[in-house]
Each structure stands twice: as C-alpha cells, then as structure tokens.
C-alpha cells in the first residue's frame, strides 16, 4: 500500500516513480502475487528498464504472450525495444530498424547475418562504412571508421577485407587513414 501511495504522489517524477515500482516489484516477488508482479514488471519495462523483460515474459499466460509482446513493442522505450528484438529474434524488425538508422547494425548485424536479410544487412553495413569514410576528415574520425570496419570483420571477415581494400584505393592520399587501417589489421 505504501509503494502504491508513493507512486501516486510521485507520478510527475519518473526517477522516484520507478523506485516505488521497484519496491512494489520486491513486495509482489516475495508474496508470490504473479499477476501484480507481471503488471509492475510491465510498468518498469515501459519506464525503460529492460532487465525485467525475461521475468515479465515468464509471467504472461502462453495464449496472451504474442499479443502482449506486440503491444509492448509499440509502447516500449528504445532500450527495451532493442532488448525485445534481440530476445525474440525479430529479424524483420531489426532489418527495418537498420534501414532507418544504419548505426543499429552494430547491435543487430550478428543476428541479421544468419537471416533472410543477411545480404541486405551486409550491403547496408558496407554503405554505412563508406558513407562515414567519405565524411571523415581527421585522424579520430578515420579511427572511428576503422573501428566500425573491425566490428564488421568479426561477423564478415571476407567482406571487410574487400571493403578495406576499396577504402585504400579510394583514399590513397589520406596517409592518416591508411595508418589507421593498418592499426586495426587491414
């Protein structure tokens, strides 16, 4: 009851609201009230706490699970949204997110490379690296491009080598860039 009163009093203060929700979580966890525990886990997820996803999912009845997950995907903050996509292996939504924002490839590429979207994901990653390289104009930006290339090589070593060669040919006069490529093993 105290935690509910605290939530009501602090609705305008998100940080305190979450603290009260966590108090309720611990109370319901100890008393074994599964339905209330599921509700508070969902509230915490909507508040941006991805750590409660697996427990929330385990508390949802099987017949409602897919509907509730889809509903949560529509309302979830980005941290929770990403957690759900990875946990549920929703490669369709991962690919969509990468089309909108190629930087999401750093998070989703390893899942996408083993999916029907593998070829498109590889193209997007290569284009993203090339585009970033085109805009780079100092050593720290070259180093950032090379780190992206190194991350790409962990999942696609052959494509990364080809791309590194393409970058060498495209920017032969940018000595600092070539040095940064060597530093990361290209």
Regions found by a protein language model. Give the residues of each.
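Eukaryote-biased, non-catalytic alpha-solenoid scaffold regions
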Residues: 1-186
């Amino acid at each position: 009851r105290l935690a509910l009163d605290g939530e009501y009093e602090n609705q305008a203060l998100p940080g305190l609201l979450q603290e009260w929700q966590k108090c309720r979580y611990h109370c319901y966890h100890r008393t074994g009230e599964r339905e209330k525990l599921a509700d508070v886990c969902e509230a915490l997820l909507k508040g941006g706490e991805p750590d409660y996803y697996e427990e929330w999912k385990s508390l949802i009845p099987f017949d409602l699970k897919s509907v509730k997950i889809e509903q949560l995907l529509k309302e979830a903050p980005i941290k929770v949204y990403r957690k759900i996509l990875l946990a549920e292996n929703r490669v369709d939504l991962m690919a969509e997110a990468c089309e909108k924002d190629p930087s999401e490839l750093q998070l989703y590429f390893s899942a996408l490379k083993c999916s029907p979207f593998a070829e498109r994901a590889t193209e997007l990653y290569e284009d993203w690296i090339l585009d970033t390289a085109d805009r780079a104009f100092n050593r720290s930006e070259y180093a950032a491009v090379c780190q992206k290339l190194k991350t790409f090589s962990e999942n696609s070593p052959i494509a990364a080598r080809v791309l590194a060669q393409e970058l060498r040919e495209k920017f032969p006069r940018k000595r600092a860039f070539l040095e940064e490529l060597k530093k990361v093993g290209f």
